[in-house]
Amino acid sequence: MVRRVALVSIVLALLAVAPSAVGKRGITETDLFTFVWVADPQMSPDGSRIAFVRVTVNEKADQYESSLWIANADGSEPPRQLTSGIRDTSPRWSPDGLRLAFARSIDKDGKAQPPQIYVMPMAGGEARAITEMARRASGPEWSPDGKTIAFAATAKPEDLAPKSGDKPRESDVRVITEAEYRANGISGSGFVDRDRPSQVWTIALPAAGEPPAPPTRVTSGEFPASSHRWSRDGSQIYFVADRRRESYYYPNDSDIFTVSKDGGEVKTLVSIDGSIIAYAPSPDGKRIAFVGIPAGKPERSYSQPDLWVADIPGGTPRNLTADYDFDINGSIGGDQRSPRGASPAGPIWSADGRSLFIKVGRHGDADLAAFDAQSGKELSGAGADPHHEVISYSADQAVQRVAAVISTPTAIGDLYVIDGMVGASPRKLTAFNDELFGQLAMTGPEEIWYTSFDGRKIQGWIQKPPSFTASQKYPLILEIHGGPHTAYGHTFTHEFQWMAAKGYVVLYTNPRGSSNYGQEFGNIIQFTYPGDDYKDLMAGVDEVLKKGYIDESRMGVTGGSGGGLLTNWVVTQTTRFKAAVSQRDISDWANFWYTADFTLFTPTWFHKAPFEDAAEFARRSPITYVDRIQTPLMFILGDEDYRTPPAAGGEDLFRALKYLKRPTVMVRFPAENHELSRSGKPWHRVERLQHIVGWFDKYLMGKPTATYP
């Protein structure tokens, strides 16, 4: 009888498993080594082909490798490899579609060399380097006549001159005069080289068999230039810059400037009271559309991006979406964007100049939408499957077809094509991860909306194990996003899927302060962070507990950056969580004010400086309440994180907790910065996941480990 009951139990358990999970395994942390990413899709002018970046992992070398691939837009043939380099990025079609420019870094004497600009004939033949810059060259952009390429470089003209004789000694002593002198992502010490800001250069395309002519620097001076583009008639080059000295004393403000293709006087093309982050001239060259973030009066910690249009030159910018309460150019937070080769996306004009197409972030989705270029009215929105994230995109010259990288909660971004721009169902062109993912038991998350303490509606998702059975009790992990003005949603996150595969239910939500829910929702936490967002998170946990399948005695919490701050805050306010992992965190706001790579000189988070209002900085700092922490707490820190420096976060709390003899451990990742989880070295990303889940396994699953005695 006992055997019969056991057999019935086994059969029932098998029936409870989702059909798609039968015969499949759970995803693992080391599956990252076989992931393939697609980035920077570039539609050919005639809409027939798409060039894109394909990124893979070289596990042995512990590095990413990127090459250029091409796909037919009609899907008639499988995508094929175009280039054989391992650091090829930024493909850009010539106006006639006969050539492709791109950036490539080669190895010399075992070391990666500064990237140079290459040009490849699409009818066949080898790619040819057209630059030989002493420092990084990037961002190739073709002139309308196809005879010249503009690019960005940090070199000076004197760097190009041949050196003779002994090299004079250069001092390694730094004289620093500005408050912002380091930047996250600069390897090593993180110090910014202000003697060599990024400038715009041009180079004429050489005739066949001829050597390239020397490049020409078009912009100069102390201010970096970014996002360069040609005017429609090819006479000017536009770029974005903040040309104010020590601009950290003022609200964020960048404008679009213009300069002759031959260099000379720089003139302001478009200016707003705020920042401009992406733009596109109209087909007739008489207008320019851009994504602008108004500075706001009084200053705000969160300003919703809007779509603007201005007549050029000299026209007054008009905010088309001032009353549209979603994020223009919005995105979704995850850990599986391409670690290399990504490119920003912006507005695209319709061929007749009457409409604008751009990505919109709203309620966990990021999808293309169309707007009237005069009134700003939304003309069309999400297509047949809105539960996804459009990561990057481009269109053909006639603006009848768009190439896009699209991700879902169960699929890393693949290349798709959308005929008719928006509203149509995307057609999938690549399937690089399908073989692997076909072996994996994965499920999509359950979307929930719940009511917080003050009646505000909060959106969240529950990721369950592949073999989930409602009658069982599961440990819960609460995930908290950073920013804090970012958002979770319908995109692939390896971390969540692996936790679920390990038997955890994962809850992730967008508490107040998140982007993609409107201006008021985003900015409501400005001078109270952390605060009521904590209550939103706890309300989410309570909502999941009502479902009956969570073991309340086995709950953990983790988050990174702003999510690390909130993780620290959570464990100072409650003991309901039995383990916590705080990543790239903040524990002491005063230390952060002094050491982060950006300043808080303007009143976006605090009204005053810490030496002017020490009590307020202490009130909102988790370190102030360290004696309350009973939860075993792990810290995940990158040694080169200058965004949330360890000295302002985990180092402080770790030392304090050791003093108090509370269970804690600090895990340090050498040569890693704030982007460890998204673009850190492959093995470090895997080890990060192993440590996070290992800590939860110890305290929530009761699995002993020698790593954390």
Regions found by a protein language model. Name each.
Residues 495, 501, 508-709:
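Active-site-proximal cap/loop segments of hydrolase catalytic domains
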Residues 72-76, 121-125, 205-209, 260-264, ...:
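Short loop/turn segments that connect beta-strands within beta-propeller blades
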Residues 30-66:
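Beta-strand-rich domains and repeat architectures in extracellular enzymes and scaffolds
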Residues 6-16:
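Bacterial N-terminal signal peptides
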Residues 56-60, 106-110, 156-159, 244-247, ...:
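Short glycine/acidic-enriched loop and turn motifs that connect beta-strands
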Residues 244-245, 326, 423-424, 430-553, ...:
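Cap/lid segment of the alpha/beta-hydrolase catalytic domain
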Residues 64-66, 154-211, 240-243, 250-255, ...:
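Predominantly five- to eight-bladed beta-propeller fold
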Residues 35-50, 85-103, 126-127, 132-152, ...:
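Conserved beta-propeller blade repeats
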